[in-house]
């Protein structure tokens, strides 16, 4: 096994990322630490515990002098108040015979932002896609272990994938609005689920209103901080929006089906700094109501927006999971310290 990231596995239907959208719709350590300090008032995280990270696979980057024995145990005993919204136990994921994730276990708290960081090819996007079974769409993908949403195994018998992806929405790296009007982008998901036709939407909104679609569109766009910018051109093609507006539209499209969890795979990596700041502000606002899980290569961004951070290292193993301030100010393994310091990645 080499450190070179594997090529992207092909989807089972060889379709583009737009089809994933359709399915989903139905730094430096100093800068990162500064962001944490600003967010937490300069308070360091909890004192560390025993914790050298796992990862005795040859492909896993390690600090000179660390032995296999020292790399046995990951520091992932992160404790938080309340129940887990998502609970992952002993998760292994394969593409054909190649293992992409190995023995990953962690609990994700509700109404918070969890960041997933690590070098390219470490498995963080694979992990994200396991949470709503988007990996089912990739040829040869196989998942072992347990992923529970509100204590129900999403890989168990009788799981309705359409309903699962409604509960666990996804926003992708590249903005991918449908080539339809802004209005139709928002109403696509509820129409697909039959909400507009059955009156479920009106009940969700707490009102019996014939203008349910209009209310839905406005509500979703307001939640995504986009309404004031587009309310006078809802009939325009969404492809005419700026990149940042398109990404917020995709977030609004996700919100329109009333999810519990929102997955974001590098949602700001293709955007300029101004648009990125708007997305970051939006993520923090969404966490007041939703459980948000974000993959990012930008460690400063992870430090700014997240409550807890999971660090994956090459080989698909979880190296460390803790409160974000602890990860950046007091990491429990040398490898994680080296990674957040930019010594490899």
UniProtKB/Swiss-Prot annotation:
The keyword Nucleotide-binding is annotated on this UniProt entry: yes
Enzyme class: translocase
Top-level taxon of the source organism: Archaea
Membrane topology reported for the UniProt record: Peripheral membrane protein
Subcellular location: Cell membrane
GO terms under biological process: phosphate ion transmembrane transport
Gly residues: bias regions: 42-52
Annotated segments matching region Disordered: 1-57
A GO term from the CC aspect: plasma membrane
Catalytic activity: phosphate(out) + ATP + H2O = ADP + 2 phosphate(in) + H(+)
E.C. code: 7.3.2.1
Domain ABC transporter, chain residue ranges per copy: 86-340
Gene Ontology MF term list: ATP binding; ATP hydrolysis activity; ATPase-coupled phosphate ion transmembrane transporter activity
Signal peptide residues on this chain, from the entry's feature table: none
Predominant place of localization: membrane
Chain segments annotated as transmembrane: none
UniProt: ATP binding residues: 118-125
Basic and acidic residues biased stretches: 8-18
Keyword list, A-Z: ATP-binding, Cell membrane, Membrane, Nucleotide-binding, Phosphate transport, Translocase, Transport
Subunit structure: The complex is composed of two ATP-binding proteins (PstB), two transmembrane proteins (PstC and PstA) and a solute-binding protein (PstS).
NCBIfam families associated with the record: 3a0107s01c2 (TIGR00972)
PANTHER family on file: ABC TRANSPORTER I FAMILY MEMBER 17
Function recorded in the entry: Part of the ABC transporter complex PstSACB involved in phosphate import. Responsible for energy coupling to the transport system.
Family according to the record: Belongs to the ABC transporter superfamily. Phosphate importer (TC 3.A.1.7) family.
Protein name in UniProt: Phosphate import ATP-binding protein PstB 2
Annotated source species: Halobacterium salinarum (strain ATCC 700922 / JCM 11081 / NRC-1)
UniProt gene name: pstB2
């Amino acid at each position: 096994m080499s450190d070179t990231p594997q090529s992207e596995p092909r989807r089972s239907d060889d379709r583009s990322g737009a089809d994933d959208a359709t399915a989903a719709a139905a730094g430096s350590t100093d800068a990162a630490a500064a962001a944490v300090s600003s967010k937490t008032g300069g308070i360091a995280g909890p004192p560390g515990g025993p914790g050298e990270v796992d990862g005795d696979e040859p492909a896993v980057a390690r600090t000179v002098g660390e032995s296999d024995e020292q790399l046995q145990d990951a520091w992932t005993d992160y404790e938080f108040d309340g129940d887990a919204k998502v609970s992952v136990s002993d998760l292994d994921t394969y593409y054909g015979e190649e293992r992409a994730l190995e023995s990953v276990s962690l609990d994700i708290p509700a109404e918070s932002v969890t960041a997933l960081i690590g070098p390219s090819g470490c498995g963080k996007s694979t992990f994200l896609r396991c949470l709503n079974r988007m990996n089912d769409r990739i040829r040869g993908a196989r998942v072992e272990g347990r992923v529970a949403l509100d204590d129900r195994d999403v890989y168990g018998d009788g799981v309705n994938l359409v309903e699962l992806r409604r509960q666990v929405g996804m926003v992708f790296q590249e903005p991918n609005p449908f080539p339809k009007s802004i209005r139709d982008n928002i109403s696509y998901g509820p129409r697909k689920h039959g909400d507009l036709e059955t009156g479920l939407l009106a009940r969700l909104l707490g009102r019996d209103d014939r203008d349910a679609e209009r209310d839905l569109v406005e509500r979703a766009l307001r939640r995504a901080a986009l309404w004031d910018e587009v309310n006078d051109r809802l009939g325009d093609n969404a492809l005419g929006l700026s990149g940042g507006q398109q990404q917020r539209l995709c977030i609004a499209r996700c919100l329109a089906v009333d999810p519990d969890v929102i997955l974001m795979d590098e949602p700001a990596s293709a955007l300029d700094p101004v648009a990125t700041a708007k997305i970051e502000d939006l993520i923090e606002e969404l966490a007041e109501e939703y459980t948000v899980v974000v993959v990012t290569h930008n460690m400063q961004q992870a430090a700014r927006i997240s409550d807890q951070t999971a660090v994956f290292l090459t080989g698909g193993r979880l190296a460390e999971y803790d409160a974000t301030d602890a990860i950046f100010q007091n990491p429990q393994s040398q490898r994680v310290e080296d990674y957040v310091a930019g010594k490899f990645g």
